[in-house]
Amino acid sequence: MSIHEFSARLINGEEKALSDYKDQVLLIVNTASKCGLTPQYEELQILYETYKDQGFTVLGFPSNQFMNQEPGDHNEIAAFCERNYGVSFPIFEKVKVNGKEAHPLFQYLTSQQGGLFTEKIKWNFTKFLIDRSGNVVKRYAPSTSPIKIKDDIEELL
């Protein structure tokens, strides 16, 4: 099994098969607009712009499961990301990342790379690095600066 077997809705409502990202290195991130870590969008965008021509993509998945820090609707989220951080990487519709109603992709991601003490995602901006074959290679804590992941990304490109 790999992440290529899943699909999710882009922020514009279009269903997107993750198999469309075959042969790309991915960084999948659960995001939020009103979090102390929200400025990580800037570094995520830098990574995307730096490596997109080499087969790298960031996939952002907004979630409102952590202290309601992503309260906006899809249009508000998209506008926020574009206006404040110039985000041009794919942003998906808001999802749940924990619990029985968690999106199947996040159920899979957490089963492949558990966190410290638990598989559960503890906060916004947890990051999962995916290789070109769709395998979950590494999980990063919310506090990990996206730029610090650069070397790991380069190894997979």
Swiss-Prot record:
Pfam families: GSHPx. Keywords: Oxidoreductase, Peroxidase. Transmembrane segments: none annotated. GO terms for molecular function: peroxidase activity. InterPro entries: Glutathione_peroxidase (IPR000889), GPX_AS (IPR029759), GPX_CS (IPR029760), Thioredoxin-like_sf (IPR036249). Gene3D superfamilies: Glutaredoxin. The active site is at C35. One of its GO terms (biological process) is cellular response to oxidative stress. PROSITE patterns: GLUTATHIONE_PEROXID_1, GLUTATHIONE_PEROXID_2, GLUTATHIONE_PEROXID_3. Belongs to the glutathione peroxidase family. This is Glutathione peroxidase homolog BsaA. It comes from Halalkalibacterium halodurans (strain ATCC BAA-125 / DSM 18197 / FERM 7344 / JCM 9153 / C-125). The lineage of its organism: Bacteria, Bacillati, Bacillota, Bacilli, Bacillales. The gene is bsaA.
